[in-house]
A protein has these predicted regions:
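Sec-dependent bacterial lipoprotein signal peptides
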Residues: 1-21
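Residues within mature, well-folded domains
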Residues: 23-170
Length: 170
């Protein structure tokens, strides 16, 4: 019976995450840059996973859809309290900006929280994975590899073999 309970709980969680991810386009369509306020954003998306102060009076609200989702949103609220930008940050263009030597704090701020973090004690490396969709609709993983000082060594992009959409051997 404990196995069945775990299975049922996992299925329920997966359904909730799937439904929540499916609501994002509706939530986004209800917001308008320059008019929507932080209250409007929080009413539609809930509390952010992280709030980043921008130094100019603006703040960026992080809405993370990892580990099950394939998008992360950064929504900027200007000093006037109005939304000035809404970006889905898990894109090939943003991945190309992640360079060797960059600190993990900067990577985290650009991409949001990763889906998975895997430390490798013997090599001293840590792998940070983000799930994303490569246009038009291919499930992929973007991996940032850091050293012990949390500096980027390299990045790589591979098919997301754990995705339910993957049709090859696992």
């Amino acid at each position: 019976m404990p196995f069945f309970n775990r299975l049922a709980s996992s299925a329920a969680l997966a359904l909730v995450l799937l439904v929540a991810a499916g609501c994002d386009p509706q939530r986004i369509s209800e917001l308008e840059e320059g008019l929507s306020t932080e209250v409007d954003v929080r009413d539609r998306f809930g509390p952010p996973d992280q709030v980043w102060d921008e130094g100019n009076g603006s703040r960026t609200l992080e809405y993370n859809r990892q580990p099950a989702g394939q998008r992360n949103y950064m929504i900027t609220i200007g000093p006037d309290g109005k939304m000035s930008a809404l970006r889905q940050v898990l894109t090939p263009e943003n991945f190309a900006r992640i360079q060797a030597g960059m600190g993990m704090d900067e990577v985290r701020r650009r991409l949001g929280k990763p889906a998975k973090v895997t430390p490798y004690a013997l090599s001293g490396e840590t792998h940070y994975d983000w799930r994303f969709l490569e246009p038009p609709n291919t499930a992929m993983l973007f991996t940032v590899v850091t050293d012990r000082s949390l500096r980027v060594l390299r990045t790589q992009t591979t098919p997301d073999m754990a995705s339910p959409d993957h049709n090859g051997p696992r």
